[in-house]
Swiss-Prot record:
Residues 30-39 have a biased composition (Basic residues). Binds to the 23S rRNA. Residues 1-61 are annotated as: Disordered. It comes from Trichlorobacter lovleyi (strain ATCC BAA-1151 / DSM 17278 / SZ) (Geobacter lovleyi). It holds the Pfam family Ribosomal_L27A. One of its GO terms (cellular component) is cytosolic large ribosomal subunit. SUPFAM superfamilies: Ribosomal proteins L15p and L18e. One of its GO terms (biological process) is translation. This is Large ribosomal subunit protein uL15.
Length: 149
């Protein structure tokens, strides 16, 4: 066997369909488009969503709601999740990431007051709820962050 005598396995390759190249090719004359009709014309494709003149589904269904362009999205962290840290430790983005608390680490963090905090922690976050601030301070912890809402 030599490299110049290698051939693809039988049935593994197909010949390209050359349309409009004479009746001997089997794909001449109408070039596989059939006779007349919309699909035989140039530019005769039917647009996506067209239902033959019936009111299309995307126009039959009502419009609903909107998404505000200036909406701020936060990663929400509850106090009960922060209770896994040791007392006196500093809890910031890196520490939360290490414990697997942040799914989307690029978003700002907001601390909510769900659950109880039993240890004094120094928590660094972008936002805190008022009740979360009260609970953290009641447990003897400190808050470091951009703002408290």
């Amino acid at each position: 066997m030599e490299l110049n005598s290698l051939r693809p396995a039988l049935g593994s390759t197909k010949n390209r369909k050359r349309i409009g190249r004479g009746i001997g090719s089997g794909h001449g004359k109408t070039a596989t488009k059939g006779h007349k009709g919309q699909k035989a014309r140039s530019g005769g494709s039917i647009k996506p969503g067209f239902e033959g003149g019936q009111m299309p589904l995307q126009r039959r269904l009502p419009k609903r709601g909107f998404r505000p362009l200036d909406r701020n999205e936060y990663v929400l962290i509850n106090l009960q999740q922060l209770d896994v840290f040791e007392a006196g430790s500093c809890v910031d983005r890196d520490a939360m990431n290490a414990k697997g608390l942040l799914k989307k680490s690029d978003l700002p963090i907001k601390v909510l007051a769900n659950g109880d905090l039993t240890k004094a922690l120094t928590i660094k976050a972008d936002k805190f709820s008022k009740s979360a601030i009260d609970k953290i301070q009641a447990a003897g912890g400190k808050i470091e962050g951009i703002s408290a809402c």
